[in-house]
Swiss-Prot record:
<feature type="binding site">
    <location>
        <position position="404"/>
    </location>
    <ligand>
        <name>L-glutamine</name>
    </ligand>
</feature>
<feature type="binding site">
    <location>
        <position position="71"/>
    </location>
    <ligand>
        <name>Mg(2+)</name>
    </ligand>
</feature>
<dbReference type="GO" id="GO:0046872">
    <property type="term" value="F:metal ion binding"/>
</dbReference>
<feature type="active site">
    <location>
        <position position="514"/>
    </location>
</feature>
<keyword id="KW-0665">Pyrimidine biosynthesis</keyword>
<dbReference type="InterPro" id="IPR029062">
    <property type="entry name" value="Class_I_gatase-like"/>
</dbReference>
<feature type="binding site">
    <location>
        <begin position="186"/>
        <end position="191"/>
    </location>
    <ligand>
        <name>UTP</name>
    </ligand>
</feature>
<feature type="region of interest" description="Amidoligase domain">
    <location>
        <begin position="1"/>
        <end position="265"/>
    </location>
</feature>
<feature type="domain" description="Glutamine amidotransferase type-1">
    <location>
        <begin position="291"/>
        <end position="541"/>
    </location>
</feature>
<comment type="similarity">
    <text>Belongs to the CTP synthase family.</text>
</comment>
<feature type="binding site">
    <location>
        <position position="469"/>
    </location>
    <ligand>
        <name>L-glutamine</name>
    </ligand>
</feature>
<dbReference type="InterPro" id="IPR027417">
    <property type="entry name" value="P-loop_NTPase"/>
</dbReference>
<dbReference type="GO" id="GO:0004359">
    <property type="term" value="F:glutaminase activity"/>
</dbReference>
<dbReference type="Pfam" id="PF06418">
    <property type="entry name" value="CTP_synth_N"/>
</dbReference>
<feature type="binding site">
    <location>
        <begin position="14"/>
        <end position="19"/>
    </location>
    <ligand>
        <name>ATP</name>
    </ligand>
</feature>
<feature type="binding site">
    <location>
        <position position="139"/>
    </location>
    <ligand>
        <name>Mg(2+)</name>
    </ligand>
</feature>
<dbReference type="GO" id="GO:0003883">
    <property type="term" value="F:CTP synthase activity"/>
</dbReference>
Length: 542
């Protein structure tokens, strides 16, 4: 039977509950346990798919096409286990499920209430489908004290009494701020956060305390006394230079041992930390450096590109180099010469996005990469714009654009109205809802034999995750191929372009899918490994 660790956060948001959950899962995995991680988000959106990147950050897409919280990306990267739609739920989805049942009459005339109906729905989500897991880690989004989180806290309180003894552990992540004028770390915010948690009937078993400097033993004892936890259960979580140091740091502080002790497990095998130590060594001892430019439109919030940042780092690990990222807001290139920003970088990456804003700037960046033979990777929107750039500047069709931007007879990129998902055709219309209506999840693509991309993958059949509503118009394939482009990846039915490359260039590839979503530190995605390898070669030309 699965054991449950409920992870809550207090004092402030963005403390890193997702990283803490992922790191703990990695430590339990290293001891040989089977671990599942789930994220419960208190917001009323059904999913984050229609939320602004500035509000939410990245939308992480799973193989089964679920649009989820970016923390699921951390879970996958740290554990190597692919998540699915059953690993993330929101208040919006819970309420929608309940209202649908009420309309069907499933509640037999009962008054539908937060307790028991909402809390029961939450508990069902937490406890269903865990037969193959030894531990289930549940991260509760938001901060203790938020009104939106109250039903979730009540649900996990109830589970403590409903599950067998020693089946539930509560871990609370807090912050100990350093007050420079006093020269002290302060415990009071943590005390008040724990008091807030205790007021809803939850007594934390473990305190994971974020701090920017070592916590004195006297302060740990103080937290132990006033928060009613064992001294050994006050774990310091010091700032580290990379998230891949976190599992090692938490193990040294005894987090995994304390978790097992709280469950009454005294004979657990020692964790095998070799691969984490190897990753940490390669990060801290690179054999060189390269610089790439990411030309985006959400660069004001780096969380909008979280998986991309990590995938680039994984490419660096594969090549034993540190990758420096120059973040460039695409709109700058609509006024400034791209050469001022791009002439010294070793690679250019144009990531996914939506909407016309910044598109012309990205097109100019792509043109610069193509003309100056700088390694280029275009992802999703980046591939679409690479096709538009080529049709304009190589084929001479000046009005080439996307139907997403404007009405034009030269729509190189258009709205997909239907596509094959497995054996079923899915259809969309321009007037349909935005939420959950894209081509989402893992799809097979066939790669052209002996193409650059097929050599990178080492195969001609791949399965990658997608998230897009628009697609390159297949009718422009012949035009682009006359000017040196190759449509090197297609959907199995030959209708949807999946990858392009430019023969007159050392490394120029665009893909319609999102390879960053499947990259892992222990298994870097081949496209990013190859892209960074190309930037290493480019750096030798400087």
């Amino acid at each position: 039977m699965a054991r449950y660790v409920f992870i809550t956060g207090g004092v402030v948001s963005s403390l890193g509950k997702g990283i803490a959950a992922a790191a703990l899962a990695a430590l339990l995995q290293a001891r040989g346990y089977r671990v599942r991680i789930r994220k419960l988000d208190p917001y009323l959106n059904v999913d984050p798919g229609t939320m602004s990147p500035y509000q939410h950050g990245e939308v992480f897409v799973t193989d089964d096409g679920s649009e989820t919280d970016l923390d699921l990306g951390h879970y996958e990267r740290f554990t190597g286990r692919s998540a699915n739609r059953h690993d993330n739920i929101t208040t919006g989805r819970i309420y929608r499920n309940i209202i649908e049942r009420e309309r069907r009459g499933d509640y037999l005339g009962a008054t539908v209430q937060v307790i028991p109906h909402v809390t029961d729905e939450i508990k069902n989500f937490i406890t269903t489908g865990n037969e193959e897991s030894d531990f289930v880690l549940c991260e509760i989004g938001g901060t203790v004290g938020d009104i939106e989180a109250m039903p979730f806290l009540e649900a996990i309180r109830q589970l403590h009494n409903e599950l067998p003894r020693q089946s539930v552990v509560y871990m609370h992540l807090t912050l100990m701020p350093y007050i420079s004028s006093a020269g002290e770390l302060k415990t009071k915010p943590t005390q008040h956060s724990v008091k807030e948690l205790q007021s809803v009937g939850i007594a934390p078993d473990i305190l994971l305390v974020r701090a920017d400097r070592p916590i004195p033993e006297s302060e740990r004892c103080k937290l132990s006394l006033f928060c009613n936890v064992r001294p050994s259960a006050v774990i310091q979580a010091l700032d580290v230079s990379t998230i891949y140091d976190v599992p090692i740091a938490y193990h040294k502080e005894g987090l995994d041992s304390e978790i097992l002790s709280a469950f009454g497990i005294d004979s657990a095998p020692e964790p095998k930390m070799d691969r984490w130590e190897d990753i940490a060594y390669r990060i801290h001892h690179p054999e060189g450096e390269v610089t790439i430019a990411i030309v985006g439109k959400y660069t004001g919030l780096k969380d909008a590109y979280k998986s991309l940042i990590e995938a680039v780092a994984h490419g660096g690990l594969a090549n034993k180099v540190k990758v420096n990222i120059e973040w460039i807001e695409a709109e700058i290139f609509e006024k400034e010469d791209p050469a001022l920003f791009l002439q010294k970088v070793h690679g250019i990456l144009v990531p996914g996005a939506f909407g016309v804003r910044g598109s012309e700037g990205k097109i100019r960046a792509i043109q610069f990469a193509r003309n100056h033979k700088i390694p280029f990777l275009g992802i999703c929107f980046g591939m679409q714009l690479a096709c538009i750039e080529a049709v304009r500047n190589l084929a001479g069709i000046e009005n080439a654009s996307s139907s997403e931007f404007c009405e034009t007879k030269d729509s190189v990129v258009g709205l997909m109205t239907e596509w094959l998902k497995g054996d079923v055709f899915e259809k969309r219309t321009a007037s349909g809802n935005l939420g959950g209506t894209m081509r989402l999840g893992a799809f097979i693509a066939q790669l052209k034999k002996d193409s650059h991309i097929s050599k990178i993958y080492g195969t001609t059949s791949i399965c990658e995750r997608h998230r897009h509503r628009y697609e390159v118009n297949i009718h422009y394939k012949d035009i682009l191929e006359r000017f040196g482009f190759v449509f090197s990846g297609m959907s199995p039915d030959g209708v949807l372009p999946e990858a392009i490359e430019y023969n007159n260039h050392p490394w120029f590839i665009g893909v319609q899918y999102h390879p960053e979503l499947k990259s892992r530190p222990f298994d870097p995605h081949p496209l990013f490994s190859s892209f960074i390898a190309a930037t290493v070669e480019q750096s030798r030309l400087f």
